[in-house]
């Protein structure tokens, strides 16, 4: 089968011929139709410090996918050959306290497909049946291929009650933009999304017309608070950028007793003004992955009830054009990039 592989410990990925995975009794074999390129895949392509310390070589990469079941393990029930599916890319154990309590996404032994084990940038993927998520007929494959990052957005946005609340989102990457769409869909009053990249903000306005976009290099966030008639500030903050400056700005823009969900990852240690957070009585929640499988149920239900994130997909390439796809993603000018394996 064709597969995109990190074959050497250096920049790039390589198209190779790899054996079709053999499945175990509790696995399924999925024929891949569409895959999304993720920021994690860019780290692996660039072979930065994180990738060099995390990813064994060789490794078939990729973890955002949609496809069709073509083989079932002998003990698999509830799934069928020909069924359209996506799936959770975090593979968990069953022995930790978190897993035994049903908090699967917090299992400390979690491994990721395309990072720790062979991934989805291939014509076929082996996946535990436990991780498989069937796709309803009204959700197309290319949306199925971005459910993983949409799940990050949903998990982050729904960390706190948003109904009637004013929400600040820092970072207008694809996940931040989808979080803005989720927040409006969930009943937030005002949703403001900030960035320093004008192209990303233009895309955010295109995907979520009812959100207010702010280029913080050109516009003062305090003026926006006044413009919207917020007496104290925002009720909820969703930090998606990993920027310390953005987090500092968010803390200042929140009401007393405000809440922050953190998904963005800083490039290193950051000097946090904890006294300001304490004296404003701010609640902070770190967000990792997707709740298994509550996040999946919620995002599929929202997609079937009017949530539209299709415009966040800006580039589509055949898999043989993967270099162009990665170049688009690395440019900082794209939304989601989808590769077609059919």
From Swiss-Prot:
The record marks 148 as: Important for catalytic activity for the proton relay mechanism but does not participate directly in the coordination of zinc atom. SUPFAM superfamilies: GroES-like (SSF50129), NAD(P)-binding Rossmann-fold domains (SSF51735). Binds 1 Zn(2+) ion per subunit. One of its GO terms (molecular function) is L-threonine 3-dehydrogenase activity. Catalyzes the NAD(+)-dependent oxidation of L-threonine to 2-amino-3-ketobutyrate. One of its GO terms (cellular component) is cytoplasm. PROSITE patterns: ADH_ZINC. Keywords: Cytoplasm, Metal-binding, NAD, Oxidoreductase, Zinc. NAD(+) binds at residues 175, 195, 200, 263-265, 287-288. Pathway: Amino-acid degradation; L-threonine degradation via oxydo-reductase pathway; glycine from L-threonine: step 1/2. Gene3D superfamilies: Medium-chain alcohol dehydrogenases, catalytic domain (3.90.180.10), NAD(P)-binding Rossmann-like Domain (3.40.50.720). Homotetramer. Belongs to the zinc-containing alcohol dehydrogenase family. This is L-threonine 3-dehydrogenase. GO terms for biological process: L-threonine catabolic process to glycine. The active site is at residues 40, 43. Transmembrane segments: none annotated. It catalyses: L-threonine + NAD(+) = (2S)-2-amino-3-oxobutanoate + NADH + H(+). Its EC number is 1.1.1.103. It comes from Ruegeria pomeroyi (strain ATCC 700808 / DSM 15171 / DSS-3) (Silicibacter pomeroyi).
